[in-house]
Amino acid sequence: MPQIKGPAIFLAQFMGDTAPYNTLPNITAWVKSLGYVGVQIPSWDSRVIDIQKAAESKAYCDDLKGQTNGLAITELASHLQGQLVASHPAYDELFDGFAAPEVRGDAKARAEWAVQQMKYVIKASANLGLTVSPSFTGALLWPFMYPWPQRPAGIVEEGFKELAKRWTPILNYADEHNVDLAYELHPGEDTHDGASFDQFLEATGNHPRVAINYDPSHFVLQCMDYVGFIDLYGSKIKAFHVKDAEYRPSAKSGVYGAFLGWKDRPGRFRSLGDGQVDFGQVFSRMTAIGYKSWAVLEWECVYKDSVQGATEGAPFIAKHLIEVPTKAFDDFAGAGSDTERNRRVLGLS
């Protein structure tokens, strides 16, 4: 069995305009001091990467790797760009801020920009020697997630058909560069659980570059079997966000969460160890399926400060990493290989 790599950290939630959070050398020095050995870079944040330059220049990428204080670049995350590949008009204004200023207010131009950005991420990943980018699919169907009023016949199929149409050229480009797109199954995306992932995968013709960024927190908040999911979709899991969550329903609110803010919702993300995810089981199953990439902290918590969350995250992940065995635990009782002996034991000779 291969061994999971880590601990690594997704930098998005920690970026800022003052040191040590404002440049790649500064922030990697900080997270290295906390015990992290890898960083997942938010490809949309110009404070740590110029994604177009990274796509166009291998020399730039080589220089970028030299700015990380010896830490590995685990992946280039592309969630915000992926979100804009497909956006229902109801969310146009809310998502506009994810895009470059020159395409805001123009849904068609914004989607075209997002497609180009995804291609930059893919080429930059290849230039950095990376083989996966965690992302979002975006959403055309999310406003119709609850079946009331009754959905028009065929609307779900049409939605996934269009989603696949938009993503297939990007996936083909990813295939040319040996990069998987690991979609995070996340509320607000048309792919938010296993069943919706299956619908998208089928609509793409089972495209080989469609993969999953596994994040158990989103499944806790949907009351799903997040450990069983690993066994069911293990061959598709190519990235791993280590994020905790808790679901504490009340007599007033449950899974939908009314319109409450994060602090008051029954379902909320938590710092590692403060929620309900059984990470012992998660890391055991991830090891069992042969997951061999990175365990990356994604920190989100309404109660705890980000610095405390990052500080606690590295030892938490390190504690859960499993050193795979070099021999079977019962080798001491083995008798070696002997064909004739095996045949005698089977009563064949």
Regions from the PLM with identified roles:
Residues R47-V48, G82-L84, L140-L141, P187-T191, ...:
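Short, small-residue-enriched loops and turns at beta-alpha junctions
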Residues P2-P7, A12, N22, G38-V39, ...:
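Acidic/histidine-rich catalytic cores of soluble enzymes
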Residues Y21-N26, W30, V85-A211, D331, ...:
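Active-site acidic/histidine proton-transfer and metal-coordination neighborhood
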Residues Q40-I41, I73-S78, L130-G138, V179-E184, ...:
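Short beta-strand segments at enzyme active-site cores
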Residues P2, N26-G35, K53-E75, D92, ...:
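Acidic (Asp/Glu)-rich catalytic clusters
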Residues F14-G16, V296-S306, G334:
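A short, acidic, flexible beta-alpha connecting loop/helix-capping segment that sits on the rim
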Residues S306-F329:
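C-terminal helical cap(s) of enzyme catalytic domains, especially alpha/beta-barrels
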Residues Q40-K65, T137-M145:
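Glycine-rich, proline-tolerant flexible connector loops at the mouths of alpha/beta enzymes
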